[in-house]
């Protein structure tokens, strides 16, 4: 099945984000935009996880279902050198445990936690929990991975699961970087409000066996 997925959003708990970014607003607007699967964003924030759990029904295998669309747990972490990383998380129990494990001075305040960990250290931490990880908006000159590193392997030391392009780049641009030739590209809007001109401005069409964490994980390996 072909799934329309927006995998990078934020909640009402992130700085400079609309108070309207709650599940019961995001879900109907996602349906209006034609999205089947949406990242929750901010999945390391305990209060946001409570709202996700209260506003959805857990279908199993990482999917939290609302009548208008399905959700999967995602978060953005600002790590060493102010580089942003997107993390996709298997379920709420893992998210709560990872939140406790992550070294961050603001993880209970801001939906986008800051951490002193390097990209490689963050990679190793999230892989302990079978999460997926990749650089957020990789070419953005302020918080993108390539603003600091000449190579993605200098950042992570190992191959991450994907490269997010975001609004600052496209596939044609990223294809000029030889080391990215065997990477999966994702493109997401990094939405800070649920309105149709923000949510799903860019999204991914992913061939999946079904809507589940396992199917997404398999799809991103191809």
Please report, for each region that a protein language model flagged, where it lies by residue.
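Active-site glycine- and acidic-residue-rich loops that bind
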Residues: 112-116
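Phosphate-interacting basic helix/loop segments used at nucleotide- and nucleic-acid interfaces
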Residues: 119-122
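Short, conserved beta-strand edge motifs with alternating hydrophobic and charged residues
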Residues: 134-136, 188
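Short, well-ordered beta-to-alpha junction loops that form the rim of enzyme active sites
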Residues: 43, 136-140
């Amino acid at each position: 099945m072909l799934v329309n997925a927006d995998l990078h959003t934020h909640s009402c708990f992130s700085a400079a984000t609309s108070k309207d970014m709650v599940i019961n607003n995001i879900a109907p607007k996602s349906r209006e935009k034609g999205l089947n699967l949406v990242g929750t964003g901010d999945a390391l924030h305990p209060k946001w996880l409570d709202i996700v759990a209260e506003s959805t029904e857990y279908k199993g295998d990482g999917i939290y279902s609302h009548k208008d669309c399905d959700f999967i747990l995602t978060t953005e972490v600002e790590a060493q050198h102010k580089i942003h990383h997107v993390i996709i998380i298997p379920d709420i129990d893992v998210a709560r445990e990872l939140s406790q494990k992550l070294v961050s001075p603001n993880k209970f305040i801001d939906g986008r936690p800051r951490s002193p960990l390097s990209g490689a250290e963050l990679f190793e931490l999230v892989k302990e929990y079978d999460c997926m990880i990749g650089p957020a908006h990789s070419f953005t000159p302020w918080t993108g991975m390539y603003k600091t590193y000449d190579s993605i392997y200098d950042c992570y030391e190992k191959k991450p699961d994907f490269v997010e392009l975001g609004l600052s780049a496209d596939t044609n641009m990223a294809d000029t970087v030889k080391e990215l030739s065997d990477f999966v590209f994702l493109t997401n809007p990094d939405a800070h409000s649920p309105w149709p001109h923000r949510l799903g401005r860019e999204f991914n069409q992913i061939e999946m066996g079904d809507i589940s964490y396992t199917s997404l994980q398999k799809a991103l390996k191809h």
